Amino acid sequence: MGQRRAALGTVSGPSTKPTLVVLAAGRARRYGGVKPLAPVGPRGEAVIDLVASDALAAGFGSIVLVLGPATGPAIRYHVEHTWPAHVDVRFALQQVPLGTVHAVLSASEHVGDTPYGVGNADDVYGRSPCSLLAAHLMALDPTNALVGFRLADAVVGTAPVTRGICQVGPDGQLRRVDERRQVTAQPDCRFAAADGREPSELSPDARVSMNLWGFTPAFHKTLQAAMAAASDASEDAEVLLPEVVAESLDTSPFTVLPAAGRCIGVTHPDDLALVQGELARQVGQGVRPAALWAPGENV
């Protein structure tokens, strides 16, 4: 199975379902473990299992996992021994941690010259938001895109988090992403950022970025150029996706796709029980299917 999954290949053709590049190379220092393998599902399913199954059910055709040398072997072993054999999954290695742009470019040979999605390996985005992105990427002439979640739907627990607050124009285009730190939920359903900046109070309806992106082939070239420029300046320069997006908005517009439903992520160890409870609640309410994969799709 491992040799089959390691086979190289590109995704091409205008009618091809898009690929989702899943960034799983992080060290997760705050969590203290391999976050993509955290057992969050009702049956002990890992975060990365839900990320992949939701994406495939929503219209993505293949998954590319960008792994790091420290946690990559454990993640790859898990995938090769638990995912259904028919799932089209490829592996890419980010040997050196040079930021999220470098991580995406590590998957270049697998995405081909077609639009593709990018997401985190430790955020359960849900099927509806993934469906929004997949449908957008399969449009006749797609733009770059960012899936925007309500702030109230993108915070789990009471521990402080960092969130990118999106400023969206009347045309639905992204104007900027304002990173706010120390964001916490308040008792009266408000949100506050204790980062010394104003406004300190944040609207629960504000759209935030949870790093669920859609990129066109033209923007992929922009990422390559940004990484090359940074590497020329310093061999160990880290380049982050939000920074390149912000610098490119004048020439590379991004459509904000407003998502409904919660984005459930694991940031701190104390989040695990909360995430498990939320996912179990979704299954009980019929929002999420009880079985991770469709009947007959077991390994």
List each language-model region with its residue ranges:
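Short glycine-enriched, charge-decorated loop/helix-capping segments at active-site entrances
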Residues: 35-40, 161
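A structural signal for short hydrophobic beta-strand segments in well-ordered beta-sheet cores
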Residues: 37, 166-168, 256
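Residue-level signal for inorganic ion chemistry
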Residues: 22, 48, 107, 122, ...
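Conserved N-terminal catalytic core of the sugar/cofactor nucleotidyltransferase
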Residues: 2-22, 28, 42-118, 125, ...
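Terminal amphipathic alpha-helical/low-complexity segments used for targeting or macromolecular assembly
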Residues: 1-7, 11-16, 52, 140, ...
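Short acidic/His/Gly/Ser-rich catalytic and metal-binding motifs that mark active-site loops
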Residues: 27-32, 186-188, 222
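Phosphate- and divalent-cation-binding pockets in alpha/beta enzyme and binding domains
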Residues: 30, 73-75, 128, 222, ...
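Conserved core of the sugar-phosphate nucleotidyltransferase
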Residues: 126-213, 217
